């Protein structure tokens, strides 16, 4: 069985039974409401989500599509900050068993302080981080030693444009999982994956990497979900869930709506 478990703050995904696939969801902290972070996370845990990506809003998010950009804008207007987010996560730390992964750009993390950021991750029950604009050399020289000190996983992204040499290097120097982006373009829902993407998934699988993979960006229905889960340890859904959360204003309703979409 694939289990996502926390040992201290270690996140391990074990992929031994191909029938059990992970589903991870992303939402932007502070959207639609400033104080709703804990409610969204607890609803996800109740509904059986395996892992949660909590977005740190930033004013210039390069990889984000319009849905997540606009969620970030709302969150910033609502007053969400890195400090506020850590305080919210700390409040629910004892109630939440799921692995939490913070996804945010380098600028707000550096502004908070890299060491302070990873220390706060431990204190608030965060297992891993995804920093889309973190150059790999800076990860190795600056970020990895600090993350390792606090036993926090730094998850790296790969795209169809990432060279095989770089993918092997990432596989060797990171733990947790590799985030396979199904497209080099910005995030957003898609109705299906074309042949080129499926060939890319097959190619990555043929590399026999030591880290499990999760596929994200563009998953919004049964076809894209199945395709992602057939080709990796699981799927990550962002834009579709964020849209539903904004429309309903209620995490339980948004999750029910998402599960409905994933059946179609």
What kind of feature is each model-predicted range?
Residues 1-8, 12-13:
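Single conserved hydrophobic/aromatic residue that forms the stacking wall/gate
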Residues 77-80, 125-139, 153-162, 181:
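Catalytic beta/alpha-barrel core
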Residues 56-58, 69-134:
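Active-site beta->alpha loop and helix N-cap motifs at the rims of alpha/beta catalytic domains
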Residues 23-27, 52-54, 100-104, 129-131, ...:
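Hydrophobic faces of well-ordered beta-strands that scaffold small-molecule active sites
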Residues 68-71, 78, 167-206, 246-249:
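Glycine/Thr-rich beta-alpha phosphate-binding loop at enzyme active sites
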Residues 64-72, 143, 240-264:
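C-terminal helical cap(s) of enzyme catalytic domains, especially alpha/beta-barrels
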Residues 34-44, 162-173, 219-235:
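Catalytic cores of alpha/beta
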Residues 51-61, 126-138, 178-189, 231-250:
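Glycine-rich phosphate-binding active-site loops on the catalytic face of alpha/beta enzymes
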């Amino acid at each position: 069985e694939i289990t996502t478990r926390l040992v201290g703050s270690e996140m391990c995904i074990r992929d031994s039974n191909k029938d059990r696939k992970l589903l991870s969801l992303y939402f932007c902290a502070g959207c639609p409401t400033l104080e709703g972070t804990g409610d969204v996370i607890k609803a996800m845990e109740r509904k059986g989500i395996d892992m949660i990506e909590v977005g740190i809003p930033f004013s210039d998010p390069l990889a984000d599509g319009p849905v997540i950009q606009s969620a970030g804008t709302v969150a910033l207007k609502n007053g969400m900050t890195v400090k506020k987010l850590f305080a919210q996560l700390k409040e629910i730390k004892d109630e939440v068993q799921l692995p939490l992964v913070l996804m945010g750009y380098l600028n707000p993390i550096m502004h908070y302080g890299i060491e302070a950021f990873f220390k706060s991750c431990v204190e608030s029950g965060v297992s891993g981080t995804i920093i889309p604009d973190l150059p790999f050399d800076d990860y190795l020289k600056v970020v990895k030693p600090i993350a390792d000190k606090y036993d926090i996983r730094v998850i790296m992204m790969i795209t169809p444009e990432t060279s095989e040499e770089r993918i092997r290097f990432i596989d060797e120097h990171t733990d947790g999982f590799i985030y396979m982006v199904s497209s080099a373009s910005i995030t957003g829902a898609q109705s299906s994956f074309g042949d080129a993407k499926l060939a890319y998934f097959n190619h990555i699988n043929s590399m026999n990497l030591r880290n499990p993979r999760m596929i994200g960006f563009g998953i919004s229905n049964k076809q894209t979900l199945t395709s992602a889960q057939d080709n990796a340890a699981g799927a990550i859904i962002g834009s579709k869930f964020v849209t539903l959360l904004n429309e309903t204003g209620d995490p339980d309703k948004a999750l029910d709506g998402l599960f409905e979409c994933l059946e179609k």
